[in-house]
């Protein structure tokens, strides 16, 4: 069997800078069922479909990118968040460049994108943080734009990270996966057979679980975290402001001009749980009183660095989600693909490592052949 990843990079799939996937007419003998229509499920399905695989994507909701993929800060990372984990930084840096190349219409530039290191509250001083980023090969400039008032920080840099465009992404993947999508379809059973895997009785050569442990258990220790972000309305030209490194906060724009999210490392979590079901119950059962209390804490925290925050922004409402995170204090959000028989499980902390995931799956299928 030919090397599938080599064919992919040589362009037989037509994936290029115009955000276009075309099938070259060559049919691959393998079929894959993919569970979960988030960023990873959609990208893996579209890539394999373009390579000639027979693919079906199962998503329990009526639209794609409905769960954690559509409820986050919508940041396309370059690695600046991860001063304490080199593997995550390098995957983010490389994944960012590939994402912009392959999906140029699914993100946009954030004109003023600030990372600031607090004087007292950061786990790293500014010069150490700067040295780590410089050695990682990511671009940045030092100093804040004119007119931005940030207090209690040791140093500031501006970075070229982007914001994801969720509405365009949904439309794009729905078109790219036309005929291969099962929306509103919750998978009831997966059974291994002698020569494949059955999803609700339908046969596939391989199955990819892209639900982050919401369907099948993962092969590493994780926790499921119910989360709360807050939406605010503010000046469209206001910069993104991210405080690093440690238990800090950030203000980041969304795809809608003038709408931002506020996130806080200590206050965004609603609780950590051993099972996805427990985390979903906590998310769905959060009370208005809890949201109000969390909002007060998050606003107090961000105003230590942006003292005019409440004068500049108006609260709109909450964003609720469940995240899957590996256990450990070392800040690992790198991408992993594990295999049990003919079933693959994907686990990653960030959108920018989607390319690593599909490459690893192709490699494992090649090994099987």
Curated annotation (Swiss-Prot):
Pathway: Secondary metabolite biosynthesis. GO terms for molecular function: monooxygenase activity. The keyword Disulfide bond does not apply. SUPFAM superfamilies: FAD/NAD(P)-binding domain (SSF51905). Disulfide bonds: none annotated. Its cofactor is FAD. InterPro entries: FAD/NAD-bd_sf (IPR036188). The keyword Flavoprotein applies. Its EC number is 1.14.13.-. It is an enzyme of class 1 (oxidoreductase). Keywords: FAD, Flavoprotein, Monooxygenase, Oxidoreductase. Belongs to the aromatic-ring hydroxylase family. This is FAD-dependent monooxygenase FPY4. It comes from Fusarium mangiferae. The gene is FPY4.
């Amino acid at each position: 069997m030919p090397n599938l990843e080599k064919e992919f990079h040589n362009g037989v799939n037509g994936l290029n800078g115009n955000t276009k996937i075309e099938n070259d007419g060559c049919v691959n003998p393998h079929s894959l069922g993919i569970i979960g229509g988030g960023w990873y499920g959609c990208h893996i399905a579209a890539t394999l479909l373009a390579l000639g695989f027979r693919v079906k994507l199962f998503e329990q909701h009526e639209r794609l990118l409905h769960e954690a993929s559509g409820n986050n800060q919508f940041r396309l990372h370059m690695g600046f968040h991860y001063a304490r984990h080199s593997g995550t930084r390098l995957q983010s840096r490389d994944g960012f460049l590939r994402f912009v190349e392959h999906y140029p219409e699914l993100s946009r530039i954030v004109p003023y994108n600030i990372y600031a290191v607090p004087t007292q509250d950061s786990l790293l001083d500014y010069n150490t943080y700067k040295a780590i980023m410089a050695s990682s090969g990511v671009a940045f400039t030092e100093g804040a734009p004119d007119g931005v008032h940030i207090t209690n920080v040791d140093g500031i840099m501006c970075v070229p990270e982007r914001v994801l465009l969720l509405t365009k992404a949904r439309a794009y993947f729905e078109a790219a996966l036309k005929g291969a999508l099962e929306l509103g379809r919750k998978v009831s059973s997966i059974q291994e057979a002698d020569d494949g895997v059955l999803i609700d009785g339908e046969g596939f050569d391989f199955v990819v679980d892209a639900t982050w442990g919401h369907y099948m258990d993962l092969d590493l220790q994780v926790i499921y975290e119910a989360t709360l972000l807050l939406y605010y309305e503010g000046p469209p030209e206001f910069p993104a402001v991210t405080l690093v490194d440690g238990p800090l906060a950030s203000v980041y724009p969304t795809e809608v001009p003038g709408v931002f999210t506020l996130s806080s490392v200590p206050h965004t979590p609603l609780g950590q749980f051993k099972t996805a079901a427990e985390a979903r119950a906590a998310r769905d059962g959060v009370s208005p009183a809890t949201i109000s209390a969390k909002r007060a804490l998050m606003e107090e925290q961000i105003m230590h660095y942006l003292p005019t925050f409440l004068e500049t922004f108006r609260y709109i409402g909450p964003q609720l989600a469940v995240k899957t995170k590996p256990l450990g204090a070392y800040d690992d959000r790198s991408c992993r693909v594990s295999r049990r028989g003919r079933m693959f499980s994907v686990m990653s902390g960030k959108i920018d490592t989607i390319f690593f995931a599909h490459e690893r799956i192709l490699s494992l299928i090649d090994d099987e052949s």
